[in-house]
């Protein structure tokens, strides 16, 4: 085991993302796996977390309750479902544990709960932990300021057949970045579905299109289309390790923060560019 003062707990340790988070923790300096959790009733409870991730024995047994590992971790990483994440948030808030939240699909009440908890604990909450995606969001701001007022803006995203929310959290973050740069409210200008006779396109709208198919890890494109030319800014992920590495990097960063709500822009200092 690596010597480290930053102990990370992974929720959903047996899932695709959970296993890659465990691999990322093993590969990265400055962190160590402190705890691994699975949902109540999972057949993986009692398994060795390292073996689940294909790393060999780690000595960390998968548990079903945060109470059982309360003293074993400093930062919790959660890429699960909103209802589960909010329960984990309440625990981390109560016990003053930092949190990395990669879960998407929260309603306004869920987002408010995260914001409130961040008054007392450090939280990095992001729709996407890929370095490349967050650089793309910065580029979208720049493009929107230059050409967003006279182009048609469309966002197209594609993910694997098992993804349960649409549009993706990343696609929504792209829309928010563009809308903010243009002084628009995404809630009032977003168009999520077109069918039948829709009429002419509203020039102030931001359209979204969603694909769910096969094993696509994640593809996102923002299109700024004018008459005679268009600019497309695209990010394609070929492995979930890019998200896992970003989340662990965020865990290292948040470990020095007593409280506050942050995103990957803060972790990567993108606002300084």
From Swiss-Prot:
Localization, UniProt: Cytoplasm
Designated name of the protein: 4-hydroxy-tetrahydrodipicolinate reductase
Gene symbol of the encoding locus: dapB
Subunit structure: Homotetramer.
The family this protein is said to belong to: Belongs to the DapB family.
Pathway, per record: Amino-acid biosynthesis; L-lysine biosynthesis via DAP pathway; (S)-tetrahydrodipicolinate from L-aspartate: step 4/4
Lineage, broadest ranks: Bacteria, Pseudomonadati, Pseudomonadota, Gammaproteobacteria, Enterobacterales
Residues that coordinate or bind NADP(+): 39
Enzyme Commission code(s) on record: 1.17.1.8
Binding, NAD(+): 12-17, 38, 102-104, 126-129
GO biological process terms on file: diaminopimelate biosynthetic process; lysine biosynthetic process via diaminopimelate
Catalysis performed (reactions): (S)-2,3,4,5-tetrahydrodipicolinate + NAD(+) + H2O = (2S,4S)-4-hydroxy-2,3,4,5-tetrahydrodipicolinate + NADH + H(+); (S)-2,3,4,5-tetrahydrodipicolinate + NADP(+) + H2O = (2S,4S)-4-hydroxy-2,3,4,5-tetrahydrodipicolinate + NADPH + H(+)
Cross-referenced Gene3D superfamilies: Dihydrodipicolinate Reductase, domain 2, NAD(P)-binding Rossmann-like Domain
UniProt function note: Catalyzes the conversion of 4-hydroxy-tetrahydrodipicolinate (HTPA) to tetrahydrodipicolinate.
């Amino acid at each position: 085991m690596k010597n480290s003062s930053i102990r990370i707990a992974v929720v959903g340790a047996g899932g695709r993302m959970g296993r890659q988070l465990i691999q990322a923790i093993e590969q990265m300096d400055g962190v160590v796996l402190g705890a691994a959790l699975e949902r109540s009733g999972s057949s993986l409870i009692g398994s060795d977390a390292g073996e689940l991730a294909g790393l060999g024995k780690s000595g960390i047994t998968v548990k079903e309750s945060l109470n059982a590992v309360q003293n074993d971790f400093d930062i919790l990483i959660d890429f699960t479902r909103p209802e589960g994440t909010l329960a984990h948030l309440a625990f981390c808030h109560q016990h003053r544990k930092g949190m990395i939240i990669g879960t998407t699909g929260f309603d306004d009440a869920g987002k408010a709960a995260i914001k409130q908890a961040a008054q007392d604990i450090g939280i990095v909450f992001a729709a996407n932990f890929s370095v490349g995606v967050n650089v793309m969001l910065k580029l979208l701001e720049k493009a929107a300021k230059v050409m967003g007022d006279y182009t048609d803006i469309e966002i197209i995203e594609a993910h694997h057949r098992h993804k349960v929310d649409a549009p993706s959290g990343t696609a929504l973050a792209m829309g928010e970045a563009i809308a903010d740069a243009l002084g628009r409210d995404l809630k009032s200008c977003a168009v999520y579905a077109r069918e039948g006779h829709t009429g002419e396109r509203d020039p102030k709208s931001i359209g979204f299109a969603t694909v769910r198919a096969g094993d696509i890890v994640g593809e996102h494109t923002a299109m700024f289309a004018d008459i005679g030319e268009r600019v497309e800014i695209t990010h394609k992920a070929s492995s979930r390790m890019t998200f896992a590495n970003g989340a662990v990097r965020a865990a290292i960063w948040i470990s020095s923060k007593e409280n506050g709500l942050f995103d990957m822009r803060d972790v990567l200092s993108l606002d300084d560019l």
